[in-house]
Amino acid sequence: MSNNEDPINEFVSNGDSFEKVKQRLKDRSKKVAQTKEILSKQANQTKEILSKQAVKIAKQAEEHESFINKVTHLLGVLGFGGFCFLLGARPQDIPYVYCLFFFIFVPLRWIYYRFKKWHYFLLDFCYYANTIFLVDLLLYPKDEKLFMVCFSFAEGPLAWALIVWRCSLVFSSVDKIVSVLIHLLPGLVFFTIRWWNPATFEAMHPEGTSGRASWPYVEDKSFLFTWLFLVPLVAYFLWQLLYFLIVNVLRRQRLLRDPEVMTSYRELSKKAQKANNVWWRLSGLLGDQNRMLMYILLQALFTVATTALTVPIFLSYELHAVFQILKVSAAVWNGGSFLLDVMPRQVILKEKKKSELQPAHIQQYHSEPKQDQSPNSMEIRMKTIHSAEEQ
């Protein structure tokens, strides 16, 4: 009898232990859910606090906008002058200046763009290419093939984007300075490494040889074509695929929910539609529903064409030097156009908005005609008052 009861007792005890384990799992899941809820609340509170602080800082910056612009202009001019001096005095240090610039200003730009809902701009090709530049300069500075790929990016799509998209060198705007330097600095870096770096000179003029070598060493035309044209295009199409998957597939619903979030396509199509220019007409060749596809095709054609132009630039020092002057001149010219044509209109619009936001009674006070304060008018008023008192 006892033998028969043992399995029953064991079964009951096992059942009790199973219930206990089940209860423990429920308790743990409740605790996890509570912890998640607490963390989400804390995250939302932190986000609200940060957004309030950001709005407060933005308002304070707007109040002192004139002073901030003057300080930015001063520092921008001094920094650009110092960079030009360093470019002539110690060209071998220019890559380190570029790396320092990238590690300081790109994270700051992400914070600023995140607040403005522009952070998807940091998925653009220029940031992808700049990341590859950092890998080359910091990890593989003597890799000739990677250098040629980076050279093709820097003096191809990035350099011509500076000209075609009219990036403006405006020293009073940190955002515009950073936009220009992201496209301009890489080309200057690889120009100095290619032609002005003392280490490159040693490789080009090795001791004990009468002939002139080159760095990077180009074996034949097929080698040049492969590493200056084909491989960069493969890397570009890889970026295009990743960009499409992230923006148009993975984050599609997020972008549809919030039309204020900007991407490069949204920004360019918005400007092109407003101006009704050639880009807007070209992007509509396949219909409005296929504008995104046309934008990708046009960008691919632009990349292929500008990448092909890097081959003669790579082979000629004179042509490469002239191209540097062309890029800087275009950025300065666009900056002058912005200061003389665009900025005055922006100032007028800001003043108009400020006047519209003023209280109605202040506007009424300013709109009322002022009374004549001349001595004759004052005398007439005094006589009128006295005569009224006598009556």
From Swiss-Prot:
Its EC number is 2.3.1.-. Coiled coil: none annotated. Pfam families: DUF2838. Residues 1-66, 114-119, 166-172, 248-294, 340-391 are cytoplasmic. Residues 380-391 have a biased composition (Basic and acidic residues). Residues 354-391 are annotated as: Disordered. It is an enzyme of class 2 (transferase). This is Glycerophosphocholine acyltransferase 1. It comes from Ricinus communis (Castor bean).
